[in-house]
A protein has these predicted regions:
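Short, flexible active-site-adjacent loop segments at beta-strand->alpha-helix junctions, enriched
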Residues: 12, 40, 62, 84, ...
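N-terminal pre-domain/capping segments
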Residues: 1-85, 161
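Charged helix-capping and loop-helix junction motifs
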Residues: 21, 72, 106-117, 144-151
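Glycine/Thr-rich phosphate-binding loops of Rossmann-like dinucleotide-binding domains
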Residues: 44, 96, 141
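Surface-exposed, active-site-proximal loop segments in enzymatic domains
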Residues: 69-75, 92-109
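Acidic/histidine-rich catalytic cores of soluble enzymes
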Residues: 126-166
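Catalytic-core regions built around general acid/base machinery
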Residues: 46-53, 116-124, 152
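Glycine/proline-rich, flexible active-site/cofactor-binding loop segments
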Residues: 75-89, 105-133
Length: 166
């Protein structure tokens, strides 16, 4: 495996800020790619300088579903960092009812979430970017109908990408 094939998911370092020493550590480990998170709120110019000074690039970023509502802002930010893939890492948290766990959604809710995600695909595609979803184990736990949440969601648009997490 080529070292350029490996990326560090920056989310895994979120408790170890500030970023300059983290990026230096990542560089020293021989990793040259990052997957960012929080693109919608980070200081892009500052982060770009940190990445450039460590010879690190980023092709993808995780953003909260709510951030998609300002697609224009995400596109501008992504392009400044040469990011090609916008990834939503989870369904939005629900505040209108109690859940057994954060993502205790029924089949209809998974289908709706898939449709909601899919409604943004063309906005990013028109700008040369892809929109995808990052899975967890719960998307592979069968719903009462026998369908998997990941199927309910991904069946809504064949252009929605899937960032698989094993």
């Amino acid at each position: 495996m080529n070292k350029q094939d490996i990326s560090v998911q920056l989310y895994t370092t979120r408790k170890f800020q500030p970023y300059p020493p983290i990026l230096n550590f990542i560089k020293e480990a021989g990793v040259v790619n990052l997957e960012l998170f929080g693109l919608e709120s980070m200081n892009i110019d500052e982060f770009k300088n940190m990445m450039e000074s460590n010879n690190i690039t980023s092709l993808s970023t995780h953003v909260g579903f709510e951030a998609l509502q300002d697609a224009k802002n995400l596109v501008e930010r992504a392009k400044k960092l040469n990011i090609k893939h916008i990834i939503v890492p989870a369904p939005p948290a629900r505040k209108d009812r109690e859940f057994k766990n954060t993502f205790d959604m029924n089949e209809e809710e998974w289908i709706t979430f898939g449709k909601d995600l899919s409604s943004y695909v063309s906005q990013f595609e028109d700008e040369g970017l892809t929109l995808g979803y990052h899975n967890h184990s719960y998307e592979f736990s069968a719903l009462p109908s026998g369908k998997l949440p990941i199927e309910c969601m991904m069946d809504q648009n064949e252009k929605l990408k899937f960032e698989i997490d094993l």
